[in-house]
A protein has these predicted regions:
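Post-signal peptide N-terminal segment of mature Sec-exported envelope proteins
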Residues: 21-49
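C-terminal motif of bacterial Sec signal peptides marking the signal peptidase cleavage site
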Residues: 11-13
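Low-complexity, Gly/Ser/Thr/Pro-rich intrinsically disordered linker/tail segments
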Residues: 183-216
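Sec-dependent signal peptide recognition
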Residues: 1-7
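Bacterial signal peptide processing site
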Residues: 15-17
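...with weaker cross-activation on analogous glycine-rich loops/strands in unrelated enzymes
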Residues: 42-47, 105-187
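Acidic helix-start/capping segments at beta-turn-to-alpha-helix junctions
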Residues: 61-82, 95-121
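Sec-exported extracytoplasmic/periplasmic mature domains
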Residues: 51, 55, 86-94, 101, ...
Length: 216
């Protein structure tokens, strides 16, 4: 299946998330992207799902928002990096809002909420949208993979987390089946320029590498 999108591929420096306009490279074109026509496993389906939600018009909006539960989402044209992951998984019938909430409710002390944010109970509106919580959840419920600087070690459907802006800002994205001109696996993420496909795997400090599929 072929989809046509208005694709922005950015090579950004870490300051973009702090509203810097500095770009090392920008490619802006009408680009044809091939989905995997007959995905053979969950992770190929996840890559297709990530590609399907690319939208450069999504505004990076880190505000706290009250949402329904389960299957709650912030307005479609807004979001942050974690919402890319949440939306892609939801296309495959997995509600990370519900999954993360239930695991946190049963294992609250294993999550960084108390230490990091001073929270003493779960919050269905925001817990699943916080990258540190997703890192704990994916490590507990999925598979933790090696962190390397070799792009070939990052496979279709993998989840990668980074620290940006001097290790101050956690970030997350989905590895796709699409390769850049350099042969690097491209990432669907939102670092401030919408839900975009970008050759950015090694742009920042990688701190997490996971696979996750709901085995229930």
């Amino acid at each position: 299946m072929k989809i046509f999108i208005f694709l922005f591929v950015f090579l950004l420096n870490c300051d973009k998330i702090n509203n810097s306009n500095t770009l090392t490279q920008q490619i802006d074109s009408n680009t044809e992207i091939n989905e995997i026509e007959n995905p053979t496993d969950f992770y190929e389906k996840l890559s297709n799902a990530a590609i399907s939600i690319i939208d450069s018009e999504v505004v990076y909006t880190p505000s706290y928002v009250s949402i329904k539960y389960p299957n709650g989402d912030v307005p479609a044209k807004t979001g942050v990096c974690s919402d890319v992951v949440i939306r892609a998984y939801r296309k495959l019938g997995i509600d990370l809002q519900k999954e993360v909430h239930e695991d946190m409710k049963a294992n609250f002390s294993l999550y960084p909420n108390l230490k990091k944010w001073g929270l003493k109970t779960t919050d269905k509106n925001i817990d699943h949208r916080r990258v540190p919580n997703l890192e704990v959840f994916f490590a507990r419920k999925g598979e933790t993979l090696p962190i390397t600087q070799n792009p070939s070690d990052y496979k279709t459907g993998d989840l990668v987390t980074w620290l940006l802006a001097g290790d101050a800002i956690p970030h997350i994205g989905i590895v796709t089946h699409i390769k850049s001109e350099n042969g690097n696996p491209m990432i669907v993420h939102n670092v401030g320029s919408g839900q975009v496909l970008e050759d950015c795997l090694l742009n920042w400090k990688i701190v997490g590498h996971f696979k996750f599929m709901n085995k229930d």
